[in-house]
Amino acid sequence: MEPVVGLQSSCAVSSFPTIEIWQDVLAQAMTGELIAAMNYTSLSEICDDPEEVADALEHAGIERGHAARFAAEGRRIGVAVQNNVEGKHWKKLREAFLRCIAARDFIGCLIVQEIMLESFAVASYARVGRVGPGTQGRTFAAIAAEEEEHIDHAMEILRAERARDVQGFDEKMYRLHLEVMTTLAEMLTKECRTGHCEVCHGTCVKPALFDISLSAAELRGASLQQYLKTLDMLGLPGEVTLQWVTQLPV
């Protein structure tokens, strides 16, 4: 489920072998999926409706399945795909979600997971799917499509919530935007500012993404476009949400 690279370390130009680049791309994706599985499991614990509990647990299982598929792609190329849900950026994202859990804020949880994290996952996975060789590309593309279904699943609930209280919903959306989207944007900034991400197995892979026809800027741009599209589907004014995005780290 989540953005493919959050790769912060020394940004000196690297000479990564292609397999090592894919190892790190898969590691970020696998970690994001495990975070999503943890989030859905936590969400199930605050749901009162048995159907909502079952739905959240089903989503958790799907995300764990995605993580397993990314690990399998690593084995296909002869590498062990590491993950680290305690990695700097992923830990911050998890903590933001857990604050919504502590407040029993079901809508806040949906906003963080389904709107913010899934938007980055859909867009970044789709981009990786276009350039990934063989089964890697097909796996990323397939999981991107599955993640998009998660967004669609949440839209009806969130639209109804916004219709009940537009101002309250939009204020919550903006508060979570500053908290969560700032971290997501930091993962794909041009310059590395906060040290190693604690997921990549070596130095920062971002400069090496060009070797597999990707770039952090491309992934960031696509992810933010998907996010804006999702906010538009919720009914938030485009002129407002565009200002939100321009405030994010670059």
Residue ranges and their predicted role:
Residues 1-250:
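Non-heme di-metal
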